[in-house]
């Protein structure tokens, strides 16, 4: 058993300059594997993520266009309301002379209701934009997390097994024993 441990300890050290050897240090090789996996994920996932973001962007832009059309319709209604208001104001001047104040109240009620409608449409547009942005962000986060998790689990299950784990522990114990003998 000691010979196996000694051979593992000697394999765990870097070979001297000019010679060839294998690095069996599991930590160093995992860094390489992880960097390769991350590189592959970034290379291949970039297109999928880009398409997903482009689709989301188009949906958000369509929502913004629809909201702008609603806003333009509301502005058009507001202009009609202003024209009607001018007409009501002229009639109000005529009726004011006669003592009528009912028209004035109707005018202000109409202005307030139109203003509230316009404010509600603006709020609806802003809420829709915010909601679509949050939904797009959450979906992108979820997909990226799932892809990263699947890649990491695939890498881990392909690289680790019990025998390799036990051999690594034995080699590290041997290294620590050798270091203790050197210091004693």
Swiss-Prot record:
CDD domains, A to Z: ATP-synt_Fo_b
Membrane topology: Single-pass membrane protein
Annotated coiled-coil segments of the chain: none
Main location: plastid
Any one GO molecular-function label of the UniProt entry: proton-transporting ATP synthase activity, rotational mechanism
UniProt cross-references to Pfam families, sorted A to Z: ATP-synt_B
Chain ranges passing through the membrane: 27-49
GO cellular component, one term: chloroplast thylakoid membrane
Purpose of the protein: F(1)F(0) ATP synthase produces ATP from ADP in the presence of a proton or sodium gradient. F-type ATPases consist of two structural domains, F(1) containing the extramembraneous catalytic core and F(0) containing the membrane proton channel, linked together by a central stalk and a peripheral stalk. During catalysis, ATP synthesis in the catalytic domain of F(1) is coupled via a rotary mechanism of the central stalk subunits to proton translocation. Component of the F(0) channel, it forms part of the peripheral stalk, linking F(1) to F(0).
Subunit structure: F-type ATPases have 2 components, F(1) - the catalytic core - and F(0) - the membrane proton channel. F(1) has five subunits: alpha(3), beta(3), gamma(1), delta(1), epsilon(1). F(0) has four main subunits: a(1), b(1), b'(1) and c(10-14). The alpha and beta chains form an alternating ring which encloses part of the gamma chain. F(1) is attached to F(0) by a central stalk formed by the gamma and epsilon chains, while a peripheral stalk is formed by the delta, b and b' chains.
PANTHER family documented for this protein: ATP SYNTHASE SUBUNIT B, CHLOROPLASTIC
Similarity comment: Belongs to the ATPase B chain family.
Other known facts: In plastids the F-type ATPase is also known as CF(1)CF(0).
Designated name of the protein: ATP synthase subunit b, chloroplastic
Organism per entry: Panax ginseng
Gene: atpF
């Amino acid at each position: 058993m000691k010979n196996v441990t000694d051979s593992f300890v000697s394999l765990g050290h870097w070979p001297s300059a000019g010679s060839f050897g294998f690095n069996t240090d599991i930590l160093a090789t995992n860094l390489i594997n992880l960097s390769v996996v991350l590189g592959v994920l970034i290379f291949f996932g970039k297109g999928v993520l880009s398409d997903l973001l482009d689709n989301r962007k188009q949906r958000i832009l369509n929502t913004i266009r629809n909201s702008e059309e609603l806003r333009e319709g509301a502005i058009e209604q507001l202009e009609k309301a202003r024209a009607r208001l001018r007409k009501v104001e002229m009639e109000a001047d005529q009726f004011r002379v006669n003592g009528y104040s009912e028209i004035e109240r109707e005018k202000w009620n109409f202005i307030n209701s139109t203003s509230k409608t316009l404010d509600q449409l603006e709020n609806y547009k802003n809420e829709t934009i915010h909601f679509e942005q949050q939904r797009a962000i959450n979906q992108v986060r979820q997909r990226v997390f799932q892809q990263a998790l699947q890649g990491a689990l695939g890498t881990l299950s392909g690289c680790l097994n019990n025998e390799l784990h036990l051999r690594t522990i034995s080699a590290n114990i041997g290294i620590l024993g050798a270091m203790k003998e050197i210091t004693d």
